[in-house]
Swiss-Prot record:
Broad enzyme group: oxidoreductase
Protein name according to UniProt: Methylsterol monooxygenase 1
A Pfam family assignment: FA_hydroxylase
Pathway(s) annotated for this protein in UniProt: Steroid biosynthesis; zymosterol biosynthesis; zymosterol from lanosterol: step 3/6; Steroid biosynthesis; cholesterol biosynthesis
Keyword hit for Iron: yes
Keyword terms of this UniProt record: Cholesterol biosynthesis, Cholesterol metabolism, Endoplasmic reticulum, Iron, Lipid biosynthesis, Lipid metabolism, Membrane, NAD, Oxidoreductase, Steroid biosynthesis, Steroid metabolism, Sterol biosynthesis, Sterol metabolism, Transmembrane, Transmembrane helix, Ubl conjugation
GO biological process: one example: cholesterol biosynthetic process
All copies of domain Fatty acid hydroxylase, residue ranges: 144-274
Intervals of motif Histidine box-1: 157-161
PTM note: Ubiquitinated by MARCHF6, leading to proteasomal degradation.
GO cellular component labels: endoplasmic reticulum membrane
Amino acid sequence: MATNKSVGVFSSASLAVEYVDSLLPENPLQEPFKNAWVYMLDNYTKFQIATWGSLIVHEAIYFLFSLPGFLFQFIPYMRKYKIQKDKPETFEGQWKCLKKILFNHFFIQLPLICGTYYFTEFFNIPYDWERMPRWYLTLARCLGCAVIEDTWHYFLHRLLHHKRIYKYIHKVHHEFQAPFGIEAEYAHPLETLILGTGFFIGIVLLCDHVILLWAWVTIRLLETIDVHSGYDIPLNPLNLVPFYTGARHHDFHHMNFIGNYASTFTWWDKLFGTDAQYHAYIEKSKKLGKKSD
């Protein structure tokens, strides 16, 4: 009975979303996107799309999303939004970071990306336009992937902070006490594999089209670069997402080294009390701010 009731609720919700979608004006970008997608299918093999397409999406999105944070350091007006104002970015640090990022991208992540084609073939993941899911279904599946990844990340990240193994793996990521956007994937190769597994679990469970893989890559990179940006920008639309961690939440993790282990949502830290030091720090900062006023 409960199962039937749940199915009825989800069916009603789906119908409601479809109805609202039918009322919206036609997306002017849909036809150009469809033409580009069909052109890609007609001119490239599935292996090329899955491998080189995924690599291009990852690299383009990663460096595009990192660009604003990189430029902020040269804009005096933006300095007031930097969270750790006493730790400015340095050329040496950013160059060191970029070299490791490129190594990880091409010697750790690229071999994994090369397996994308075989994954889609094994699970019969479609590429064609006719089976392209509606935007709200893709968004819902990306949300599911985010919840799964966040859960994996919280517990494995917390494990990597164990005193017996921290210095061997996760210490690399904490070389920068004040994070910056491009540093999001600066990590020991083993950490890239361990924490990166959480990204793929959702794909294995929820992927119904190759577009979901690229959409999820985009959303995950947007989130991780944002929380590593080192800047708390007002009117950041990501802060409208319920339970979203945000830059201040993760910045404190880099500054304090413990606590705030989640990647995207705050509920695991709240449930296990691993955000207690963060909230105490926020309260102390507010009191000091009032005294200075």
